[in-house]
Amino acid sequence: MAGSAPSAEDGTNGDPAGYPAGVLAAAVLATTGVSFVLVGSAALWLRGESIPVGDADVVIEPGEQNMQRTRAALADLALQPHAVPQAARLAMLDIVTIMTSYGKIDCLLRRGRLDWERLRKNADVMPVAGTGVMVAASADAWRLRSRFKDVRR
């Protein structure tokens, strides 16, 4: 359960804050001012699902200013900053994956262009490690997860 003491059984991988790395990656991204909704396993974990968290899947709000913030934040967080596309390119891509010291962040950019209003409307801000993270509703997170997993098979 979110916020409980870490243990080997609860999926926190012994993290001292009690959060999986993917959840912490989303929290760090949230502190940068990037507007996004957390989806995928990290969102489901925060919603109380017993699910392993592999990474942070974030749907980025479309718009030039947010793309500029996203590019700057990802470049600051990335293990290889030169690999982060410029903001104008980000606005055209479907998915960008960035490796950080907190783990992998998948930026679902196309999903933001298609579903931002609905995802944002159904999402809630949840406290994570001292900051607020916009977290998708469980139904939305499950729907995106099943759609994305089906496409990747």
Language-model regions, residue ranges each:
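Compositionally biased terminal segments of proteins
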Residues: 1-153
